[in-house]
Amino acid sequence: MPIDWFTVIAQGINFLLLLWLLKRFLYHPIIDGLDAREKKIAGILADADTCKSQAENLRTEYESKLAHIEQERTQLVGEAKNEAQMASQSLLDNARHNAEQIVKKRVAALRLEMAELKQDVLQQNIHEVYAISRKVLTELADGDLHTKMIDKLVQRLNTLDDDQHAALTRALANSGNQIVVRSAQPLAEAQKKQLLACLQQYLPSFKKDSSQNNSVNAAPSNPAPSIKLSESIVPRLINGIELTMGGWKLAWSTDNYLAELQEDVEAEFIPFTETLLGLPENEGTDNPEANPPHAEAKIPHA
């Protein structure tokens, strides 16, 4: 079969034209669309990678912040626990201290009450013993004992030292030779004369002689008229006598013994009770009666 070259060439040209047309109007738009789509997908993937990277950064940042917050929370919880423990310990210490102070105050109050009670009981016992002693001695007192007490007073008057002698002489001069005699029982005339004879030696104008020194207790026939006796009965003296002149007093009686005994006991007792009570020494003992305005000469005990 013979070849028709015109037809072959025409078909070749048609084929090439078809290829160009397909490429121009079909393949090229498809390829461009594929390229555009590929670029778009690549952009989307790039954006996704960027977002993923940002997300990773955010996650890392948030995890760091969470770790920091957890650390701060742990620190704050620890500080809160420490502060709570310190506050609790402080409250316990304060409560313990307050309780100890209350106990100490209560113990001190109880000791004070006990000391005051002891003081009251002992002072009451002292006064009761003193009152009983006075009562017993008062009941046992008689005339003979009273006479002996006066004799003892006269004997003591004759044995005064120089200072007491001078003080008694000044007291007589200041009183105008007026003497107040206080005793539990009335004085007999002989006893009055005996006292006057003894006191006469203390007159400024009196001159001692040997006859007067040898008859101290004898009742003189002519008592010194310059001395005036004023007698006063004082039952509290029990047995004894007090001579008062010019603000000066000379006493010799059983009541003096009892009073001195009471003073000695209280003098020993008061410092002890004041120590228990926490008082300074001599506190509460200052009173006007402790130092009377007149001078008192206490004759030493036999």
Swiss-Prot record:
Localisation per UniProt entry? Cell inner membrane
Its keywords, alphabetically, are:
ATP synthesis, Cell inner membrane, Cell membrane, CF(0), Hydrogen ion transport, Ion transport, Membrane, Transmembrane, Transmembrane helix, Transport
| Any one of the GO CC terms | proton-transporting ATP synthase complex
Q: Which domain of life is it from?
A: Bacteria
Membrane topology according to the record: Single-pass membrane protein
Q: Which residues form a coiled coil?
A: none
Q: Where is this region: Disordered?
A: 278-302
Q: Has keyword NAD?
A: no
Sequence intervals crossing the membrane: 5-22
What is an example of a GO molecular function annotated in this UniProt entry?
proton-transporting ATP synthase activity, rotational mechanism
Q: Mind telling me which InterPro entries this protein's record contains?
A: Alt_ATP_synth_F0_bsu, ATP_synth_b/b'su_bac/chlpt, ATP_synth_F0_bsu_bac, ATP_synthase_B_chain
Q: Function of this protein?
A: F(1)F(0) ATP synthase produces ATP from ADP in the presence of a proton or sodium gradient. F-type ATPases consist of two structural domains, F(1) containing the extramembraneous catalytic core and F(0) containing the membrane proton channel, linked together by a central stalk and a peripheral stalk. During catalysis, ATP synthesis in the catalytic domain of F(1) is coupled via a rotary mechanism of the central stalk subunits to proton translocation.
Under the heading PANTHER family, the entry gives: ATP SYNTHASE SUBUNIT B', CHLOROPLASTIC (PTHR33445:SF2)
Q: Which family does it belong to?
A: Belongs to the ATPase B chain family.
- What subunit structure does UniProt give? F-type ATPases have 2 components, F(1) - the catalytic core - and F(0) - the membrane proton channel. F(1) has five subunits: alpha(3), beta(3), gamma(1), delta(1), epsilon(1). F(0) has three main subunits: a(1), b(2) and c(10-14). The alpha and beta chains form an alternating ring which encloses part of the gamma chain. F(1) is attached to F(0) by a central stalk formed by the gamma and epsilon chains, while a peripheral stalk is formed by the delta and b chains.
- This chain belongs to the protein called ATP synthase subunit b 1
State the species of origin.
Answer: Pseudoalteromonas atlantica (strain T6c / ATCC BAA-1087)
